[in-house]
Amino acid sequence: MCGESAPDPNRHGERGPVTTISVVIPCYNDATFLEVVLAALAAQTRPADEVIVVDNASTDASARVARAAGAVLVVEPVHGIWPAAATGYDAASGDLIARLDADSVPPPDWIARAEAILTLAPLVDVLTGPGDFYDCPRWVAALGRFVYLGGYFRLIGLWLAQPPIFGSNFVMRRAVWAEVRGLVHRERDDVHDDLDLSLHLPPSVTVWFDPTLRVGISARPCETWRGIARRLDWAYCTLALHGQAGSPWRLRLARRAWARRLRS
């Protein structure tokens, strides 16, 4: 689903109202960024019920910053975004599991907006939104927004037959993680965790992209050609891991079959 129109809150009624929200932040040697994102979470109009920082074997002050902010500190010694993120999701106790990166900067209404959408639209299982690059020239930010992120949402959205999850800015229902936690390639450090998670979602799981659910993100991934090439390699590796099961035509057929089942 894309965010052109408001979600229909009446399509399913079996899921209860949202009550608790956990925010998971994987962190590796990002103490300075971490301090900023934790301050942004402290300023939310609807505070998180739980903030979990996953220390991915950092050697800087990340752990100290997390404790000082009152976050729950979880240690994941296996290096990689996926191992750290998965450990955080496992530790989360909220009905909703939200995800930010250490260099994300959410606006004050980020949690409140996500909670409102997911409460009003019980059919939506995962809510995701875009990012705005904040630490680069305007032309780089525009390039990142329209080419890097725009390409991801459009091309991978066509591949999946629904919007992909953006790892720096999403919220999923707890039941979604419970369903896929044993399937994802959580031990790998050479894949995109958000793309891998998106590819493992069954046809019954609906992802909603809301263009107004924005967060600030760092331009560090796009600073060098080497960084861009590494992320392209991760994308290739992620798609290759899923083989025929993750082919576009199979995914589209599966989602169409599920849609027909819902209508019948």
What do the predicted segments below correspond to?
Residues 55-63, 104:
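A conserved acidic beta->alpha catalytic loop
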Residues 188-197:
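Acidic donor-binding loop at a coil-to-helix junction in glycosyltransferase catalytic cores
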Residues 39-48:
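Short, acidic, metal-binding catalytic loop of nucleotide-sugar glycosyltransferases
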Residues 129-134, 142-163:
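Short, flexible, basic/aromatic active-site loop/helix in glycosyltransferases
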Residues 109-140:
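Conserved donor NDP-sugar-binding/catalytic core segment of glycosyltransferases
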Residues 32-35, 60-68:
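Acidic helix N-cap motif at the loop->helix transition within catalytic regions
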Residues 94-105:
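Short beta-strand-to-loop acidic/aromatic patch adjacent to the donor-nucleotide binding site
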Residues 76-92:
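Glycine-rich, basic loop-to-helix element that forms the pyrophosphate-binding segment
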